[in-house]
């Protein structure tokens, strides 16, 4: 099934996801992978073909464009943002599969490798009976996070351009790199974007509307041991691997991702590597509540002090850095931005699902740059892996929401 209202939506999505735009946390370049710049150049060309204005790629690989106002009064400028990169999972040779009129049963993604999208494991599938699903072939992610957001924004401005009877102010759009590795928005230029408020199209199922995110930090423990021949090690050896395990044991056992939900924060053991002489343990710290976030950071500082005191020397050094903050701190003073999106959904018969993100978006950083930017659903499910899928109808609804926000903005 193709979209009747947005005739190029499905084709555009299927084409875009085949671009491998996986970002690379180990890279120090901007963007982190060359393929993102290639994709940006392709997007720029297609936006030019649509006849948008002020189209450019800035030095940080953000594709910017404007759909100029067609109204004779001053209205606010609204922006829509999505990211080009995909998560740290195989994205080479993405081969999307289309499941028409989904029957509610298990979906075989890859017969040869016996990879099955099972309803028992993913009961969210039951929400999509009779819909058109786009899945992976079981060997890659899909990239609906966030190619669906890009497609929805482009299809919305295309629709508005084709329907000049819909009055609107200036509409700004931007597609950026490296969201998945938490760096892209560091280089977002709010002044250059020139919107009064914006939305990221980077959420999950229909109805999601998010204006609160985690506060986030990374704690890196660098451990220095003393390596001595095991046969003569008594009183001399300090085993960095054992210190690494001590550090891990000191963390609270229930404040972990797999045991928390809602507004509960956590410590997540992200990485560890060690031998006798040296080691490194990396945790990420997350909490919506600022006071609890600060307390968690204080906990890791005290942990290091305790370990060093035990060994009578500095065996552990801590590198603690903040990554992003809860955008709700900013958006709470601009709740009209949330109210407009909520009203747009209700006008379309969509029930808004307002909840705090257990993560972050580009909007987490952009909001603190002075541009309030909540997050709206883009339709995908099971992000960052081979079981990712999106319903065509969900992407249509997200596109409808963009158009409706634009209408409401012009009426304010």
UniProtKB/Swiss-Prot annotation:
Binding locations of Zn(2+) 1: 83, 145, 202
Q: Give the matching SUPFAM superfamilies.
A: Bacterial exopeptidase dimerisation domain, Zn-dependent exopeptidases
Q: So what does this thing catalyse?
A: Release of the N-terminal residue from a tripeptide
Binding-site list for Zn(2+) 2: 145, 180, 384
Query: What cofactor requirement does the entry state?
Result: Zn(2+)
The entry's cellular-component GO terms read: cytosol
Note accompanying the cofactor annotation: Binds 2 Zn(2+) ions per subunit.
The record ties this protein, via Gene3D superfamilies, to: 3.30.70.360, Zn peptidases (3.40.630.10)
Record keyword Cytoplasm present:
yes
Q: Where in the cell is it found?
A: Cytoplasm
The catalytic site is made up of 85, 179 (proton acceptor)
What are the record keywords, sorted?
Answer: Aminopeptidase, Cytoplasm, Hydrolase, Metal-binding, Metalloprotease, Protease, Zinc
Its EC number(s): 3.4.11.4
The primary location reported for this protein is: cytoplasm
Which Pfam families does the entry mention? M20_dimer, Peptidase_M20
Its EC top class is hydrolase
GO terms (BP aspect):
peptide catabolic process; proteolysis
Mind telling me which InterPro entries this protein's record contains? ArgE/DapE_CS, Bact_exopeptidase_dim_dom, Peptidase_M20, Peptidase_M20_dimer, Peptidase_M20B
Q: What GO molecular functions are on record for this protein? A: metallopeptidase activity; tripeptide aminopeptidase activity; zinc ion binding
The protein's job, in short, is: Cleaves the N-terminal amino acid of tripeptides.
Q: Which family does it belong to?
A: Belongs to the peptidase M20B family.
Name assigned to this protein:
Peptidase T
Tell me the gene name: pepT
């Amino acid at each position: 099934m193709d979209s009747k209202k947005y005739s190029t939506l499905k084709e555009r999505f299927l084409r875009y996801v085949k671009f491998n735009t996986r970002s690379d946390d180990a890279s120090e370049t901007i963007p982190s992978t060359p393929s993102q710049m290639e994709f940006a150049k392709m997007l720029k060309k297609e936006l030019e073909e649509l006849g948008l204005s002020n189209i450019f790629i800035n030095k940080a690989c953000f594709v910017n464009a404007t759909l100029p106002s067609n109204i004779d009064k001053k209205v606010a400028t609204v922006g829509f943002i999505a990211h080009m990169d995909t998560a740290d999972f195989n994205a080479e040779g993405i081969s999307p599969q289309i499941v028409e009129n989904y029957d509610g049963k298990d979906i075989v993604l890859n017969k040869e490798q016996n990879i099955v999208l099972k309803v028992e494991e993913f009961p969210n599938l039951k929400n999509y009976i009779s819909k058109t699903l786009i899945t992976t072939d079981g060997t890659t992610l899909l990239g609906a996070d966030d190619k669906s957001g890009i497609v929805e924004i482009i299809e919305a401005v295309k629709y508005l351009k084709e329907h000049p009877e819909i009055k609107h102010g200036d509409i700004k759009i931007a597609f950026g790199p490296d969201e998945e590795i938490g760096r892209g928005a560091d280089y977002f230029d709010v002044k250059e974007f020139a919107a009064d408020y914006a939305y990221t199209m980077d959420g999950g199922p229909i109805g999601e509307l998010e204006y609160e995110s985690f506060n986030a930090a990374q704690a890196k423990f660098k451990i220095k041991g003393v390596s001595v021949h095991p046969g003569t090690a008594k009183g001399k050896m300090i085993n960095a691997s054992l210190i690494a395990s001590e550090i891990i044991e000191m963390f609270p056992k229930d404040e972990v991702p797999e045991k928390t939900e809602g507004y509960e924060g956590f410590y997540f053991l992200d990485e560890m590597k060690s031998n006798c002489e040296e080691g490194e343990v990396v945790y990420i710290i997350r909490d919506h509540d600022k006071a609890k976030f600060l307390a968690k950071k204080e906990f890791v500082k005290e942990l290091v002090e305790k370990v060093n005191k035990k060994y009578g020397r500095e065996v552990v050094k801590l590198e603690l850095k903040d990554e992003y903050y809860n955008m709700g701190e900013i958006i709470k003073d601009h709740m009209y931005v949330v109210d407009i999106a909520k009203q747009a959904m209700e006008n379309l018969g969509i029930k808004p699902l307002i909840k705090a993100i257990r993560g972050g978006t580009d909007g987490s950083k952009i909001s603190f740059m002075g541009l309030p930017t909540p997050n709206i659903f883009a339709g995908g499910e099971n992000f960052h892996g081979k079981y990712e899928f999106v319903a065509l109808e969900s992407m249509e609804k997200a596109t409808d929401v963009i158009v409706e926000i634009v209408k409401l903005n012009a009426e304010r």
